[in-house]
Structure formats: structure tokens, C-alpha cells
Swiss-Prot record:
InterPro entries: Ribosomal_uL11 (IPR000911), Ribosomal_uL11_bac-typ (IPR006519), Ribosomal_uL11_C (IPR020783), Ribosomal_uL11_C_sf (IPR036769), Ribosomal_uL11_CS (IPR020785), Ribosomal_uL11_N (IPR020784), Ribosomal_uL11_N_sf (IPR036796). Part of the ribosomal stalk of the 50S ribosomal subunit. Interacts with L10 and the large rRNA to form the base of the stalk. L10 forms an elongated spine to which L12 dimers bind in a sequential fashion forming a multimeric L10(L12)X complex. One of its GO terms (molecular function) is large ribosomal subunit rRNA binding. The keyword RNA-binding applies. This is Large ribosomal subunit protein uL11. Forms part of the ribosomal stalk which helps the ribosome interact with GTP-bound translation factors. It comes from Streptococcus agalactiae serotype V (strain ATCC BAA-611 / 2603 V/R). CDD domains: Ribosomal_L11 (cd00349). Keywords: Methylation, Ribonucleoprotein, Ribosomal protein, RNA-binding, rRNA-binding. Pfam families: Ribosomal_L11 (PF00298), Ribosomal_L11_N (PF03946). One or more lysine residues are methylated. Belongs to the universal ribosomal protein uL11 family. Disulfide bonds: none annotated.
Length: 141
């Protein structure tokens, strides 16, 4: 019989840098799972994506065992990396901080496709463009 999921924990952790310190430790401690076991496994799985923030969904079972699914980095993180900026605009409608090309948007949309609720690449690109605009980026052809 399949194990019963007791709790789902969602976190965003820098790839390869999970530690028992907050925010990871307290979130996992409340769920009652082995914090060191999770951090070692997460760091091993995400070592190749250093520098990115990786969303993770941890399923905690009744017997306190767990497994987790890593997702693709948030669109905002990928956009900032592609544009080479530290952060988006505080006033996106007035102040534009960077320019990004449609080719870069397409590349990000292809990366994010498994996690996006989009039927095709074109709609995924529109989602990414919307995120870029809300961050104060200009999208050019």
C-alpha cells in the first residue's frame, strides 16, 4: 500500500547551499523529518545548478520519511540572470532597468515549460514576457 502523505513543505533554497539554519531547519523540524538527510540529498541533486534559487516541494509521510521534487528556478531569477541585473525596477511602469530579447524570453520559456501551466511555447513566452514587464524590463525583437 502507498504511504500516506502527512504534510507538504514548499521552500525556495539556493542550489547546493541547503543548511540546517533558517529557513530550512525550522520548516523541516516542524514536519519532523531528518534535516541533515534532506540537506545532503538536496545539495547533491542541485550541485550542477549553483547560483540559482530552486523551489522544492517536500512530501512528508506518516512514518516521517520524505521525498522531494525540485522545480525550475523562478522566472524572475532567470530573467535577472539573462539581463545581468541585481534586481527589478521599483517602479516598473516608470523606470525601465534592462532590455531582454525575444530569443532570451524563448530560452527561459523552454526552461520553465515543465512547471508552467501553458499549452504551448507561445503562451509560455507570453507569461515570461509579462513577468519581465512587471519587473521593469523592456522586451525587444
Amino acid at each position: 500500500m502507498a504511504k500516506k502523505v502527512e504534510k507538504l513543505v514548499k521552500l525556495q533554497i539556493p542550489a547546493g547551499k541547503a543548511t540546517p539554519a533558517p529557513p530550512v531547519g525550522p520548516a523541516l523540524g516542524q514536519a519532523g523529518i531528518n534535516i541533515m538527510g534532506f540537506t545532503k540529498e538536496f545539495n547533491a541533486r542541485t550541485a550542477d545548478q549553483a547560483g540559482m534559487i530552486i523551489p522544492v516541494v517536500i512530501s512528508v509521510y506518516e512514518d516521517k520519511s520524505f521525498d522531494f521534487i525540485t522545480k525550475t528556478p523562478p522566472a524572475a531569477v532567470l530573467l535577472k540572470k539573462a539581463a545581468g541585473v541585481e534586481k527589478g525596477s521599483g517602479e516598473p511602469n516608470k523606470t525601465k532597468v534592462a532590455t531582454i530579447t525575444r530569443a532570451q524570453v524563448q530560452e527561459i520559456a523552454e526552461t520553465k515549460m515543465p512547471d508552467l501551466n501553458a499549452a504551448n511555447l507561445e503562451s509560455a513566452m507570453r507569461m515570461i514576457e509579462g513577468t519581465a514587464r512587471s519587473m521593469g524590463f523592456t522586451v525587444t525583437d
